[in-house]
């Protein structure tokens, strides 16, 4: 809570245009709910984590996570598990929010080079647009698709002005430290800390290891 307060002071002094504020634990009771009028809510993949506090099922955790949804604020989320989708969409409906779900069908990996990935995105905002992320982490394709969709929602609502070329260049420059980060030959660092995250890491590492342990 102290760090969040300090962050708000820094944002204010720097006169930032947009703040990306990530919840620390869940959402419903998280300190970030001090922000009463966000311009957009984003919910990434929901998996079992912090079960002692958030609940021991995906559905219980989804209810906590959906607690960030505010009245008349659009929400962009990963639409994969039906039970989770139902909870998020119901919360959005109850709060008169437009909900935008990003599904596995929206994006397709064109080529994975190990150190970067080319993929295409096809939804209401992108028509098979191609992007490149500078990481071999396959799971980041989904995360990037979520971020790109969120950016377009912000553009649609008039919060930001974005040019297509600038978006493509920005995506290519993004780096995720501590997520499939190569720090030496054959040595990668990744902060996966729950079963789903570990499965995603294994999926990304497998093409690189080629059967080696």
Describe the function of each predicted region:
Residues 111-128:
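Acidic-glycine-rich active-site phosphate/pyrophosphate-binding loop
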Residues 97-103, 181, 188:
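General small-molecule cofactor/ligand-binding pocket signal
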Residues 28-29, 35-96:
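Conserved catalytic-core segment of NTP-binding enzymes
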Residues 104-106, 110-111:
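Conserved "HGTGT" condensation-loop signature of ketosynthase/thiolase-family condensing enzymes
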Residues 80-82, 100, 118, 137:
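Active-site glycine/GP-rich loop and adjacent strand/helix microenvironment
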